[in-house]
Amino acid sequence: MAKAKFERTKAHVNIGTIGHVDHGKTTLTAAISKVLYDKYPDLNEARDFATIDSAPEERQRGITINISHVEYQTEKRHYAHVDAPGHADYIKNMITGAAQMDGAILVVAATDGPMAQTREHVLLARQVGVPALLVALNKSDMVEDEELLERVEMEVRQLLSSRSFDVDEAPVIRTSALKALEGDPQWVKSVEDLMDAVDEYIPDPVRDKDKPFLMPIEDVFTITGRGTVVTGRAERGTLKINSEVEIVGIRDVQKTTVTGIEMFHKQLDEAWAGENCGLLVRGLKRDDVERGQVLVEPGSITPHTNFEANVYILSKDEGGRHTPFYSNYRAQFYFRTTDVTGVITLPEGTEMVMPGDTTEMSVELIQPIAMEEGLGFAIREGGRTVGSGRVTKITK
């Protein structure tokens, strides 16, 4: 029997283009795909570059986002590239986590330098935890003055450093997406250089499997003669049988040991990220545990009630509220598998929030939830989603 061809598996990395409108994000996305197709035709598909700009509407968790996904490969890696052409779409996408980015290319037109949206996108990238940014100084073919190019590069580096991005190491590559699409060799090389920099500078994502174990609890039941079983889908990490774990959230933290692991009625020695499993926990009664708690590697996550967040409030057309809300608005915050009531305080100077708005807010929950920065949640009212956000800072 012929052996199947050995495929060297490449790291898979999610990246995106960010930056001010009309600085060339979409053109650069097209140029990257074309240049990589020409360089590695066996690794990449040819595509019609007009399709990237007419980004299809996607509905994620009821939120409409215009977004296009492009895939391409370098010798080293496989990339999934997200491009959200509209500013509002981009902001929604970042906040709702419709596309998690392992790194991003900040596109700044050399003719303009950093603009308002450039600053807003860099701030958001910091708040939602994009690990690495590098810079494409686009439209560089239109600036002949070397001093001007150097000044724009310095401004961009200052902006990155003001948001605590690593500015000394961050590559800044001068590109012309349009000229690269037209096949001009100098600028084709600029896009090749950019992708070499992306390969080198954006770190391999830490796979979920290598993080500390976490399983949101969906259900709890008793098996006569064996004890209490909690079920859920492991979100990250691996768990071996007889490991000590903590149950965190809603009540005081409890310690226990996992004495059995089951998946589809088969006994397993360990549970892995992405698997739906039942865990037998020692010494706990059915009433000691509830949906909405998480079962975790000890010490890896803590329970909190107060946090700051970045939130997108659904518009009326997306099935959201029809009316604005004000400070002291009470709603349900849906984290992982459960709703917890919370009270919202709006930032100073924000009187009210309209449907369709993006806002920052502080929240106080009535029960603690296992929380870390970057954690996503939905805001719900009477069972329907009215907002989507992520934790930017834990305050208590």
From Swiss-Prot:
tr-type G domain ranges (all copies): 10-206
EC numbers listed for it are 3.6.5.3
Q: Name which cysteines form disulfide bonds.
A: none
Annotated residues for binding of Mg(2+)? T26
Query: Entry's CDD domains?
Result: EF_Tu, EFTU_II, EFTU_III
**Mind listing the UniProt keywords for this protein, alphabetically?**
Cytoplasm, Elongation factor, GTP-binding, Hydrolase, Magnesium, Metal-binding, Nucleotide-binding, Protein biosynthesis
Catalysed reactions, semicolon-separated: GTP + H2O = GDP + phosphate + H(+)
- Where is the stretch described as G3? 83-86
> What's in the GO CC field?
cytosol
Q: Please give the subunit comment from the record.
A: Monomer.
The record describes the protein's role as: GTP hydrolase that promotes the GTP-dependent binding of aminoacyl-tRNA to the A-site of ribosomes during protein biosynthesis.
Name the UniProt record assigns to this protein? Elongation factor Tu
Organism, as annotated: Micrococcus luteus (Micrococcus lysodeikticus)
GN (gene name): tuf
